[in-house]
Protein backbone atom coordinates (compact mmCIF):
# COMPACT_ATOMS: atom_id res chain seq x y z
CA UNK A 1 0.00 0.00 0.00
CA UNK A 2 1.99 2.95 -1.28
CA UNK A 3 -0.87 5.32 -2.10
CA UNK A 4 -3.47 7.30 -0.20
CA UNK A 5 -7.00 7.95 -1.40
CA UNK A 6 -8.32 11.17 0.15
CA UNK A 7 -11.85 12.53 -0.03
CA UNK A 8 -11.47 16.26 0.30
CA UNK A 9 -13.39 19.36 1.33
CA UNK A 10 -13.23 18.41 5.01
CA UNK A 11 -13.04 20.55 8.13
CA UNK A 12 -10.59 19.13 10.64
CA UNK A 13 -11.59 19.48 14.29
CA UNK A 14 -10.79 17.79 17.57
CA UNK A 15 -7.94 16.60 19.75
CA UNK A 16 -4.67 14.97 18.77
CA UNK A 17 -1.93 13.36 20.86
CA UNK A 18 1.53 14.36 19.66
CA UNK A 19 4.15 11.63 19.35
CA UNK A 20 7.75 11.69 20.47
CA UNK A 21 10.26 13.53 18.30
CA UNK A 22 11.86 11.49 15.55
CA UNK A 23 14.71 13.98 15.30
CA UNK A 24 15.50 13.53 18.99
CA UNK A 25 14.93 9.78 19.12
CA UNK A 26 17.32 8.93 16.27
CA UNK A 27 20.53 10.44 17.70
CA UNK A 28 19.63 9.22 21.18
CA UNK A 29 19.22 5.66 19.90
CA UNK A 30 22.69 5.74 18.37
CA UNK A 31 24.21 7.33 21.49
CA UNK A 32 23.39 4.11 23.37
CA UNK A 33 26.48 2.61 21.69
CA UNK A 34 28.58 4.77 24.04
CA UNK A 35 27.63 2.66 27.07
CA UNK A 36 27.52 -1.06 27.80
CA UNK A 37 24.84 -0.60 30.44
CA UNK A 38 21.10 -1.07 29.97
CA UNK A 39 18.94 1.80 28.74
CA UNK A 40 15.20 2.50 28.74
CA UNK A 41 13.91 5.13 26.32
CA UNK A 42 10.23 6.09 26.47
CA UNK A 43 7.88 8.04 24.17
CA UNK A 44 9.60 6.57 21.12
CA UNK A 45 7.46 7.04 17.98
CA UNK A 46 6.65 4.05 15.82
CA UNK A 47 8.14 5.16 12.51
CA UNK A 48 9.96 3.69 9.55
CA UNK A 49 13.18 5.59 10.34
CA UNK A 50 13.07 4.47 13.97
CA UNK A 51 12.59 0.87 12.88
CA UNK A 52 15.64 1.13 10.60
CA UNK A 53 17.68 2.60 13.47
CA UNK A 54 16.65 -0.35 15.66
CA UNK A 55 17.64 -2.77 12.88
CA UNK A 56 21.02 -1.02 12.59
CA UNK A 57 21.71 -1.45 16.30
CA UNK A 58 20.59 -5.08 16.19
CA UNK A 59 22.86 -5.69 13.19
CA UNK A 60 25.79 -4.73 15.43
CA UNK A 61 24.69 -7.15 18.14
CA UNK A 62 22.50 -5.00 20.41
CA UNK A 63 19.60 -6.58 22.29
CA UNK A 64 16.44 -4.47 21.89
CA UNK A 65 12.82 -4.81 22.93
CA UNK A 66 10.12 -2.37 21.78
CA UNK A 67 6.99 -2.36 23.94
CA UNK A 68 4.29 0.32 24.16
CA UNK A 69 6.52 3.15 22.90
CA UNK A 70 9.29 2.05 25.27
CA UNK A 71 12.64 0.83 24.02
CA UNK A 72 14.77 -1.40 26.22
CA UNK A 73 18.32 -1.41 24.86
CA UNK A 74 21.36 -3.43 25.86
CA UNK A 75 24.43 -2.74 23.71
CA UNK A 76 26.87 -4.74 25.84
CA UNK A 77 27.03 -7.48 23.21
CA UNK A 78 27.92 -5.20 20.29
CA UNK A 79 31.05 -6.53 18.57
CA UNK A 80 30.81 -5.04 15.07
CA UNK A 81 32.11 -1.59 14.12
CA UNK A 82 30.64 -1.39 10.61
CA UNK A 83 26.85 -1.45 10.09
CA UNK A 84 25.48 -2.94 6.83
CA UNK A 85 25.12 -0.78 3.74
CA UNK A 86 21.56 -1.90 2.99
CA UNK A 87 20.43 -0.20 6.22
CA UNK A 88 22.73 2.84 6.43
CA UNK A 89 21.75 3.91 2.92
CA UNK A 90 18.13 4.27 4.01
CA UNK A 91 18.49 6.99 6.67
CA UNK A 92 20.80 9.94 6.89
CA UNK A 93 20.80 9.66 10.68
CA UNK A 94 23.09 6.63 10.39
CA UNK A 95 26.02 9.09 10.27
CA UNK A 96 25.51 9.49 14.04
CA UNK A 97 26.81 5.95 14.52
CA UNK A 98 30.29 7.00 13.38
CA UNK A 99 31.51 8.74 16.55
CA UNK A 100 30.06 6.26 19.09
CA UNK A 101 31.49 3.26 17.21
CA UNK A 102 34.85 5.02 16.84
CA UNK A 103 35.06 5.71 20.57
CA UNK A 104 33.95 2.23 21.57
CA UNK A 105 36.15 0.21 19.20
CA UNK A 106 38.87 2.65 18.16
CA UNK A 107 37.67 2.30 14.59
CA UNK A 108 34.47 2.60 12.59
CA UNK A 109 33.33 2.25 9.02
CA UNK A 110 30.06 3.79 7.86
CA UNK A 111 28.70 3.62 4.35
CA UNK A 112 27.45 6.98 3.15
CA UNK A 113 23.94 7.49 4.54
CA UNK A 114 20.65 8.16 2.77
CA UNK A 115 17.35 9.90 3.59
CA UNK A 116 15.37 12.75 2.06
CA UNK A 117 16.63 14.12 -1.23
CA UNK A 118 16.79 17.75 -0.12
CA UNK A 119 19.90 19.44 -1.43
CA UNK A 120 23.46 18.40 -0.74
CA UNK A 121 23.36 18.06 3.06
CA UNK A 122 27.15 17.56 3.21
CA UNK A 123 28.79 15.54 5.99
CA UNK A 124 32.10 17.40 5.85
CA UNK A 125 31.33 19.25 9.09
CA UNK A 126 31.02 15.93 10.95
CA UNK A 127 34.38 14.83 9.57
CA UNK A 128 36.16 18.11 10.38
CA UNK A 129 34.92 17.93 13.95
CA UNK A 130 36.20 14.39 14.47
CA UNK A 131 39.57 15.21 12.90
CA UNK A 132 39.91 18.22 15.22
CA UNK A 133 39.45 15.89 18.20
CA UNK A 134 42.19 13.57 16.93
CA UNK A 135 40.50 11.03 14.67
CA UNK A 136 42.00 9.83 11.41
CA UNK A 137 39.40 9.85 8.64
CA UNK A 138 39.51 8.20 5.23
CA UNK A 139 36.70 9.19 2.89
CA UNK A 140 36.16 6.82 -0.02
CA UNK A 141 33.51 6.91 -2.72
CA UNK A 142 30.90 4.98 -0.76
CA UNK A 143 32.03 5.00 2.86
CA UNK A 144 33.78 6.81 5.71
CA UNK A 145 36.47 5.02 7.70
CA UNK A 146 37.58 6.47 11.05
CA UNK A 147 40.27 5.34 13.49
CA UNK A 148 42.12 6.49 16.60
CA UNK A 149 45.37 5.27 18.17
CA UNK A 150 44.73 7.05 21.47
CA UNK A 151 41.68 8.65 23.16
CA UNK A 152 40.26 11.75 21.53
CA UNK A 153 41.42 15.04 23.04
CA UNK A 154 39.13 17.95 23.84
CA UNK A 155 39.50 21.07 21.71
CA UNK A 156 37.75 24.33 20.95
CA UNK A 157 35.86 23.59 17.73
CA UNK A 158 34.12 26.18 15.58
CA UNK A 159 31.46 24.67 13.30
CA UNK A 160 31.65 26.74 10.13
CA UNK A 161 27.97 26.46 9.26
CA UNK A 162 25.28 25.85 11.86
CA UNK A 163 24.53 22.14 11.68
CA UNK A 164 22.37 19.98 13.93
CA UNK A 165 24.05 16.83 12.66
CA UNK A 166 27.62 18.04 13.16
CA UNK A 167 26.83 19.50 16.58
CA UNK A 168 25.51 16.12 17.75
CA UNK A 169 28.48 14.25 16.26
CA UNK A 170 31.06 16.46 17.98
CA UNK A 171 29.11 16.51 21.24
CA UNK A 172 28.89 12.71 21.34
CA UNK A 173 32.57 12.28 20.45
CA UNK A 174 33.65 14.76 23.13
CA UNK A 175 31.63 13.02 25.85
CA UNK A 176 34.36 10.42 26.43
CA UNK A 177 37.32 12.47 25.19
CA UNK A 178 40.18 13.60 27.41
CA UNK A 179 39.85 17.16 28.63
CA UNK A 180 37.26 19.77 27.72
CA UNK A 181 35.70 20.44 24.33
CA UNK A 182 34.01 23.72 23.49
CA UNK A 183 31.69 23.76 20.47
CA UNK A 184 31.34 27.25 19.00
CA UNK A 185 28.51 28.18 16.61
CA UNK A 186 26.60 25.12 17.82
CA UNK A 187 23.08 24.43 16.61
CA UNK A 188 20.48 25.23 19.27
CA UNK A 189 17.58 22.94 18.37
CA UNK A 190 15.48 21.32 21.14
CA UNK A 191 16.58 17.94 19.81
CA UNK A 192 20.18 18.81 20.72
CA UNK A 193 19.06 19.77 24.22
CA UNK A 194 17.30 16.41 24.52
CA UNK A 195 20.33 14.47 23.28
CA UNK A 196 22.57 16.28 25.78
CA UNK A 197 20.06 15.61 28.56
CA UNK A 198 20.13 11.90 27.70
CA UNK A 199 23.94 11.79 27.71
CA UNK A 200 24.05 13.65 31.03
CA UNK A 201 21.64 11.09 32.46
CA UNK A 202 24.27 8.48 31.59
CA UNK A 203 26.99 10.43 33.37
CA UNK A 204 28.24 12.85 30.71
CA UNK A 205 29.20 16.41 31.65
CA UNK A 206 27.60 18.68 29.04
CA UNK A 207 26.72 22.31 29.73
CA UNK A 208 25.16 24.86 27.40
CA UNK A 209 23.17 22.67 25.01
CA UNK A 210 20.52 24.89 23.46
CA UNK A 211 22.94 27.83 23.18
CA UNK A 212 25.53 28.56 20.50
CA UNK A 213 28.36 27.46 22.81
CA UNK A 214 28.44 23.98 24.35
CA UNK A 215 31.00 22.84 26.95
CA UNK A 216 31.74 19.12 27.26
CA UNK A 217 34.10 17.86 29.95
CA UNK A 218 35.11 14.34 29.04
CA UNK A 219 34.36 11.50 31.44
CA UNK A 220 35.89 8.03 31.69
CA UNK A 221 32.74 5.98 31.22
CA UNK A 222 28.96 6.17 30.92
CA UNK A 223 26.34 4.27 32.88
CA UNK A 224 22.78 3.15 32.11
CA UNK A 225 19.60 5.09 32.67
CA UNK A 226 16.09 6.10 31.63
CA UNK A 227 15.03 8.92 29.33
CA UNK A 228 11.79 10.22 27.82
CA UNK A 229 11.90 11.64 24.28
CA UNK A 230 10.56 15.19 23.87
CA UNK A 231 7.38 15.81 21.81
CA UNK A 232 7.69 16.28 18.07
CA UNK A 233 7.44 20.02 17.40
CA UNK A 234 7.14 19.54 13.63
CA UNK A 235 4.28 17.07 13.97
CA UNK A 236 2.61 19.59 16.28
CA UNK A 237 3.02 22.36 13.72
CA UNK A 238 1.72 20.15 10.93
CA UNK A 239 -1.51 19.38 12.79
CA UNK A 240 -1.97 23.05 13.67
CA UNK A 241 -1.72 23.83 9.96
CA UNK A 242 -4.28 21.08 9.24
CA UNK A 243 -6.86 22.89 11.35
CA UNK A 244 -5.88 26.34 10.08
CA UNK A 245 -6.25 25.51 6.37
CA UNK A 246 -9.60 23.76 6.91
CA UNK A 247 -11.13 26.54 9.03
CA UNK A 248 -11.12 24.12 11.91
CA UNK A 249 -10.36 23.83 15.60
CA UNK A 250 -7.74 21.65 17.27
CA UNK A 251 -6.03 20.98 20.57
CA UNK A 252 -2.61 19.34 20.37
CA UNK A 253 -1.81 17.45 23.57
CA UNK A 254 1.52 16.22 24.99
CA UNK A 255 3.50 18.91 23.19
CA UNK A 256 5.90 21.76 24.08
CA UNK A 257 4.61 25.25 23.16
CA UNK A 258 7.97 26.85 24.02
CA UNK A 259 9.60 25.07 21.08
CA UNK A 260 7.11 26.52 18.57
CA UNK A 261 7.19 30.24 19.28
CA UNK A 262 7.86 31.32 15.68
CA UNK A 263 5.31 28.89 14.24
CA UNK A 264 2.63 30.05 16.69
CA UNK A 265 3.44 33.68 15.97
CA UNK A 266 2.96 33.14 12.23
CA UNK A 267 -0.27 31.20 12.75
CA UNK A 268 -1.57 34.03 14.89
CA UNK A 269 -0.53 36.46 12.17
CA UNK A 270 -2.57 34.41 9.70
CA UNK A 271 -5.69 34.98 11.79
CA UNK A 272 -5.76 31.92 14.04
CA UNK A 273 -6.69 32.26 17.70
CA UNK A 274 -3.96 30.53 19.72
CA UNK A 275 -4.01 29.45 23.35
CA UNK A 276 -1.33 27.45 25.12
CA UNK A 277 -0.83 25.57 28.37
CA UNK A 278 2.02 23.63 29.91
CA UNK A 279 1.73 20.75 27.44
CA UNK A 280 -1.01 21.74 24.99
CA UNK A 281 -1.74 24.17 22.16
CA UNK A 282 -5.20 25.17 20.98
CA UNK A 283 -5.87 26.70 17.55
CA UNK A 284 -9.21 28.08 16.37
CA UNK A 285 -9.69 29.18 12.75
CA UNK A 286 -13.44 28.52 12.54
CA UNK A 287 -15.27 30.89 10.24
CA UNK A 288 -12.07 32.46 8.95
CA UNK A 289 -10.00 32.32 5.79
CA UNK A 290 -6.27 32.47 6.57
CA UNK A 291 -4.36 35.64 5.83
CA UNK A 292 -1.17 35.23 3.80
CA UNK A 293 2.11 35.57 5.66
CA UNK A 294 5.77 36.09 4.83
CA UNK A 295 8.33 33.62 6.16
CA UNK A 296 12.11 33.32 6.07
CA UNK A 297 13.56 30.06 7.37
CA UNK A 298 16.61 30.03 9.63
CA UNK A 299 18.25 27.77 12.22
CA UNK A 300 16.51 27.44 15.58
CA UNK A 301 15.25 29.56 17.27
CA UNK A 302 14.29 30.94 13.86
CA UNK A 303 11.46 29.67 11.69
CA UNK A 304 11.96 25.93 11.01
CA UNK A 305 12.65 24.80 7.47
CA UNK A 306 10.63 21.65 8.20
CA UNK A 307 7.47 23.80 8.47
CA UNK A 308 8.06 25.68 5.24
CA UNK A 309 6.01 23.39 2.91
CA UNK A 310 3.01 23.37 5.25
CA UNK A 311 2.94 27.17 5.40
CA UNK A 312 3.22 27.32 1.61
CA UNK A 313 -0.04 25.35 1.53
CA UNK A 314 -1.62 27.81 3.96
CA UNK A 315 -0.53 30.72 1.77
CA UNK A 316 -1.92 28.93 -1.29
CA UNK A 317 -5.49 29.15 0.05
CA UNK A 318 -5.09 32.48 1.86
CA UNK A 319 -6.70 35.84 1.22
CA UNK A 320 -3.83 37.42 -0.69
CA UNK A 321 -0.15 36.83 -1.52
CA UNK A 322 2.73 35.68 0.66
CA UNK A 323 6.44 35.02 0.18
CA UNK A 324 8.44 32.19 1.71
CA UNK A 325 12.25 32.28 1.58
CA UNK A 326 14.23 29.08 2.17
CA UNK A 327 17.67 29.73 3.67
CA UNK A 328 18.61 26.26 4.94
CA UNK A 329 18.34 23.78 2.07
CA UNK A 330 18.44 24.22 -1.66
CA UNK A 331 16.00 22.25 -3.80
CA UNK A 332 13.27 22.26 -1.15
CA UNK A 333 10.44 23.45 -3.39
CA UNK A 334 9.91 20.15 -5.23
CA UNK A 335 6.45 19.76 -3.71
CA UNK A 336 5.21 23.02 -5.27
CA UNK A 337 4.75 21.45 -8.72
CA UNK A 338 2.21 19.06 -7.19
CA UNK A 339 0.34 21.86 -5.41
CA UNK A 340 0.24 23.74 -8.70
CA UNK A 341 -1.41 20.69 -10.29
CA UNK A 342 -4.12 21.05 -7.63
CA UNK A 343 -4.72 24.68 -8.57
CA UNK A 344 -2.26 26.57 -6.38
CA UNK A 345 -0.66 29.70 -7.84
CA UNK A 346 2.99 29.47 -6.88
CA UNK A 347 6.03 31.02 -8.54
CA UNK A 348 9.61 30.14 -7.66
CA UNK A 349 12.13 32.99 -7.58
CA UNK A 350 15.63 31.81 -6.66
CA UNK A 351 15.37 30.60 -3.04
CA UNK A 352 11.87 32.02 -2.54
CA UNK A 353 8.33 31.17 -3.55
CA UNK A 354 5.46 33.58 -3.97
CA UNK A 355 2.03 32.07 -3.29
CA UNK A 356 -1.11 33.88 -4.41
CA UNK A 357 -4.13 32.57 -2.56
CA UNK A 358 -6.93 30.85 -4.48
CA UNK A 359 -10.49 30.09 -3.30
CA UNK A 360 -10.10 26.32 -3.54
CA UNK A 361 -7.72 23.53 -4.45
CA UNK A 362 -8.95 20.64 -6.60
CA UNK A 363 -8.30 16.92 -6.54
CA UNK A 364 -5.40 15.45 -8.48
CA UNK A 365 -3.11 12.45 -8.57
CA UNK A 366 0.05 13.76 -6.91
CA UNK A 367 3.47 12.30 -6.18
CA UNK A 368 5.48 12.97 -3.02
CA UNK A 369 9.26 13.35 -3.02
CA UNK A 370 10.22 14.07 0.58
CA UNK A 371 8.94 13.85 4.14
CA UNK A 372 7.47 17.30 4.78
CA UNK A 373 6.33 17.78 1.20
CA UNK A 374 4.50 14.46 1.42
CA UNK A 375 2.64 15.51 4.58
CA UNK A 376 1.75 18.81 2.91
CA UNK A 377 0.21 17.01 -0.08
CA UNK A 378 -1.87 14.86 2.27
CA UNK A 379 -3.19 17.99 3.98
CA UNK A 380 -3.89 19.55 0.59
CA UNK A 381 -5.94 16.49 -0.32
CA UNK A 382 -7.99 16.87 2.86
CA UNK A 383 -9.22 20.34 1.85
CA UNK A 384 -9.29 20.00 -1.96
CA UNK A 385 -12.55 19.62 -3.86
CA UNK A 386 -12.96 16.02 -5.00
CA UNK A 387 -10.82 12.96 -4.39
CA UNK A 388 -7.02 13.15 -4.35
CA UNK A 389 -4.53 10.30 -4.67
CA UNK A 390 -1.09 10.73 -3.07
CA UNK A 391 1.56 8.35 -4.39
CA UNK A 392 4.95 7.39 -2.88
CA UNK A 393 3.68 7.89 0.66
CA UNK A 394 6.53 6.04 2.36
CA UNK A 395 8.10 9.47 2.82
CA UNK A 396 5.60 10.70 5.41
CA UNK A 397 5.69 7.32 7.12
CA UNK A 398 9.34 8.11 7.90
CA UNK A 399 8.39 11.01 10.15
CA UNK A 400 4.72 10.94 11.17
CA UNK A 401 3.33 8.25 13.46
CA UNK A 402 -0.19 7.10 12.46
CA UNK A 403 -0.60 10.28 10.39
CA UNK A 404 -3.65 9.26 8.36
CA UNK A 405 -5.30 7.66 11.42
CA UNK A 406 -4.89 10.86 13.45
CA UNK A 407 -6.25 12.97 10.59
CA UNK A 408 -9.24 10.65 10.20
CA UNK A 409 -10.08 11.14 13.88
CA UNK A 410 -10.17 14.88 13.16
CA UNK A 411 -12.67 14.41 10.35
CA UNK A 412 -10.58 13.50 7.30
CA UNK A 413 -11.46 10.57 5.04
CA UNK A 414 -8.19 8.88 4.10
CA UNK A 415 -7.74 5.32 2.92
CA UNK A 416 -4.72 3.27 1.89
CA UNK A 417 -4.90 1.72 -1.57
Swiss-Prot record:
- On this chain, the residues bearing 2-(S-cysteinyl)pyruvic acid O-phosphothioketal are 116
What's in the keyword line of the UniProt record? Cell cycle, Cell division, Cell shape, Cell wall biogenesis/degradation, Cytoplasm, Peptidoglycan synthesis, Pyruvate, Transferase
Provide a GO biological process annotation: regulation of cell shape
EC number(s) recorded for this UniProt protein: 2.5.1.7
Q: Which GO terms describe its cellular component?
A: cytoplasm
GO MF term (any one): UDP-N-acetylglucosamine 1-carboxyvinyltransferase activity
* Top EC category: transferase
What the entry lists under SUPFAM superfamilies is as follows: EPT/RTPC-like
Q: Which Gene3D superfamilies match?
A: Enolpyruvate transferase domain
Establish whether keyword Nucleotide-binding is in the entry: no
Subcellular location as annotated: Cytoplasm
Which residues are responsible for catalysis?
Answer: 116
Q: In which pathway does it act?
A: Cell wall biogenesis; peptidoglycan biosynthesis
Q: Which residues bind phosphoenolpyruvate?
A: 22-23
Return the NCBIfam families for the record: murA, PRK09369.1
**Function of the molecule:** Cell wall formation. Adds enolpyruvyl to UDP-N-acetylglucosamine.
Query: What is the protein name for this chain?
Result: UDP-N-acetylglucosamine 1-carboxyvinyltransferase
The gene for this chain is murA
Amino acid sequence: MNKLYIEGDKKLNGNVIISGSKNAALPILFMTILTEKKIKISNVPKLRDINIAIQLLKSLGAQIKYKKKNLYIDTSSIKIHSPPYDLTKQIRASIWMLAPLLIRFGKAKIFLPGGCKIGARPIDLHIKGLIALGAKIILEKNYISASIKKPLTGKRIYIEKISVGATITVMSAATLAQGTTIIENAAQEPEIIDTAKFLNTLGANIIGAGSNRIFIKGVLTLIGGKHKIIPDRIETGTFLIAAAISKGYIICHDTEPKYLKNVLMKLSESGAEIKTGKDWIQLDMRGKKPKSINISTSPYPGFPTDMQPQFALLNSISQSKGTITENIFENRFIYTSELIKMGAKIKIKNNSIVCKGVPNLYSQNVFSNDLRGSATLVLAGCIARGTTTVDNIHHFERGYEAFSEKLNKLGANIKYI
